[in-house]
Regions:
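Bacterial N-terminal signal peptides that target proteins for export
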Residues: 2-9
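Periplasmic c-type cytochrome electron-transfer domains
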Residues: 6, 20-413
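Bacterial N-terminal signal peptides
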Residues: 10-18
Length: 413
């Protein structure tokens, strides 16, 4: 990146985090029955989100109603009678996505396992892998990590704020990120997936491994694998421990369990996608002089080589998503993270590869990293490896004041 480009990115970062004026002056587990909906009155905002969980600005009344209906569905509780299980990780979406507001992440982890032998990853699908569900509708169906597994990984639930904007970023922009030359041995490659929602080959961008390309596919994947509800996109139930007898014994609801409501033409997964699509990105925190200085350190250290500050959505019939700048701080590419990888192959991602996590709202999601191993931002940086090793080392060589400036900046975005 040239000096001119670095200055441009720095100015863009500062402008996006609301510093134009400053710069001018300075340089689970409740298994109750499926609850009746509570309808939420959501005020249509006229400016950017002011708190976590707000809807996007510029939504139409119809879009805002879809957001509210999606929010209700997101909080609904499933039971065995409605299709829950036979194995599952929780009974509702909100159970794992509530911090610091509905649509956020949580400290709840899911367990992934597999076996690596002779350089090949086996998800042990015949034993229920690679995802182990923590709960079952009957104890005899309970899953465990099989003895054959030699890789076990934990993954936190991810925050959903701003995902509509990320969905609206064109594939071409992500491909361009991969093609742009990068220093420090950083490469990065797009996750090319078959999108079950459209049937098209797309660039994945959702999930720790960028394994889904659209919010509808992301919703359907989670509804099946986290709650055990089949849908038109994912119609095949998970067999407990891969045992088809157990599946026949405990799965009594006809598939797909997520049926389309004839009154609205929408199934639950459509409502989940509406909620995520119209959920605003994290609000910006107030800025300090230290955070302003930290923007420059962010660039100088090389963080922006992967955590790209800005991308832009393509044209859209949805005004709130139409040609918007997206300060996500991610290139949405897969990178070989060395020891920081989780050891699980998924989609097109190799065991050591992880998607660059967007940094917006970072201050609200400790502990950090995919498995929550880092209690602080500083610890998370120091645990970077693989392609990020040189940038990590550059950070460790900063003096304490520069490190604090960078940390203050990261807490502000």
């Amino acid at each position: 990146m040239t000096t001119r480009q670095r200055i441009y990115v720095a100015i863009a970062i500062i402008t996006l985090i609301g510093l134009g004026n400053v710069l001018a002056q300075t340089q689970f587990k409740d298994q109750r029955s499926r609850a009746p909906r509570q309808h939420h009155n959501v005020a249509l905002p006229t400016t950017a989100a002011t708190q976590f969980g707000d809807p996007l600005a510029d939504l139409t009344p119809t879009q805002l109603a879809d957001f509210a209906a999606g929010l209700d569905e997101f909080q609904s509780v499933d039971t065995a009678e409605s299709g829950l299980g036979p194995v599952f990780n929780n009974v509702s979406c909100v159970a794992c996505h509530s911090d610091p507001a509905i649509g956020g992440g949580s400290v709840i982890h899911e367990t992934r396992f597999g076996r690596i032998a002779n350089g090949h990853f086996d998800p042990l699908a015949e034993l229920g892998g690679s995802l182990m569900q923590d709960f079952a509708i009957d104890p005899t169906a309970q899953e465990v990590v099989p003895a054959q597994a030699n890789v076990v990984a934990k993954r936190k639930s991810t925050p959903l704020f701003g995902l509509g904007l990320i969905e609206a970023i064109p594939d071409s922009a992500i491909l361009q990120n991969a093609q742009n030359p990068k220093p420090d041995g950083i490469t990065g490659r797009p996750s090319i997936v078959q999108d079950v929602a459209t049937g098209h080959t797309r660039i994945g961008r959702f999930g720790w491994k960028a394994q889904q390309a659209t919010l509808l596919a992301f919703a359907g994947d989670a509804y099946l694998n986290e709650i055990g509800i089949t849908s038109r996109l994912f119609p095949q139930e998970n067999a407990p421990r891969g045992d088809l007898y157990m599946l026949e014994l405990y799965d009594h609801v006809a598939d797909p369990e997520d049926a389309v409501d004839p009154a609205t033409g929408k199934a639950d997964i459509d409502r989940f996608a509406d909620f995520m699509r119209y959920l605003a990105p994290p609000p910006r925190a107030s800025l300090t002089q230290s955070a302003i200085a930290g923007a420059a350190v962010f660039l100088q250290t090389g963080c922006e080589n992967c955590h790209r500050a800005l991308m832009q959505t393509s044209s859209s019939t949805i005004r709130a998503l139409d040609r918007k700048l997206v300060p996500l701080f991610s290139d949405l590419l897969l990178h070989d993270m060395g020891s920081l990888g989780d050891g699980i192959a998924q989609g097109t991602a190799a065991p050591a590869e992880m998607k660059t996590a967007p940094l917006w709202g970072l201050r609200a999601r400790t502990p950090l990293l995919h498995d929550g191993r880092a209690p602080t931002i500083d610890a998370a940086i120091r645990l970077h490896d693989g392609e990020a090793a040189k940038v990590r080392d550059r950070y460790t060589r900063l003096n304490s004041a520069q490190q604090q400036q960078l940390l203050d900046f990261l807490k502000s975005i």
